[in-house]
């Protein structure tokens, strides 16, 4: 099983671009699990992509009540431990997406970035 995080900006809303990019990156993968942080934007579009492709979804929602502002970063670290790769949709501004990219690189997880 190939576990790939699809993450990115909460303002990212171009599903066709996400689908085309993910299709390209995942073209040689057979058994795929989409890993989602459950945020609006790219994460939710990644879930839509998973449903369209009949890929299972591993959900990692941030626990904002327990961890406050640190919840997103804690969630990113958990996804980084679990996943085999990251596909990030980044506007070069989102701190949460930057943290996910940095976490993946630190864990030596192959990372593809779609800049928007």
Give residue ranges: language-model regions.
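Acidic/glycine-enriched connector segments
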Residues: 12-116
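Glycine-rich phosphate-binding "P-loop"
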Residues: 1-16
């Amino acid at each position: 099983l190939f576990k790939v995080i699809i993450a990115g900006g909460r303002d990212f809303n171009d599903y066709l671009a996400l689908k085309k990019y993910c299709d390209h990156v995942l073209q040689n993968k057979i058994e795929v699990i989409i890993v989602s942080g459950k945020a609006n934007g790219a994460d939710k579009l990644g879930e839509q992509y998973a449903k369209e492709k009949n890929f299972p979804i591993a959900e990692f929602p941030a626990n904002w009540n327990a961890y406050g502002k640190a919840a997103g970063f804690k969630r990113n670290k958990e996804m980084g431990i679990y996943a085999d790769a990251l596909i990030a949709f980044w506007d070069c501004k989102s701190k949460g997406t930057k943290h996910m990219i940095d976490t993946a690189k630190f864990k030596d997880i192959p990372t593809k970035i779609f800049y928007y």
